[in-house]
Amino acid sequence: MRLLLILVLLTPVIVAFSVDEELNNADGANAASFTADQEVRHKRNLFPAIARRGLDVELKSDGCPKYCPPGISCCFGDNCATSATSGKMECLKNPRQFV
């Protein structure tokens, strides 16, 4: 009986989230299909803890941080190195090519 009551109470919440997700995809994209940009954002969930803390972080097109000042880590596979063009510490895929 309790299980049925819990199910009945949770159904409106589940439906509300489903409708909200469809409204967010009102630009013509099907809710089941990801664009390439959405797929990248979906896969990058190693980094968003910093973004959730409210730090102003500039992101690259792949969703990883562009610069690596103290307190900001690069995504997996990136390394923090000084860029030859800007002179700033940047998260780079292959930093040896910029040194």
Swiss-Prot record:
GO annotations of cellular component type: extracellular region
Tissue: Expressed by the venom duct.
Protein modification: Contains 3 disulfide bonds.
Top-level taxon in the UniProt lineage: Eukaryota
Subcellular localization(s) per the UniProt record: Secreted
Positions annotated as propeptide: 22-53
Main location: secreted
Signal peptide: 1-21
Notes concerning its domains: The cysteine framework is VI/VII (C-C-CC-C-C). Has the PXY motif between the first and the second Cys residues.
Protein name: Teretoxin Tsu6.4
Organism of derivation: Terebra subulata (Chocolate spotted auger)
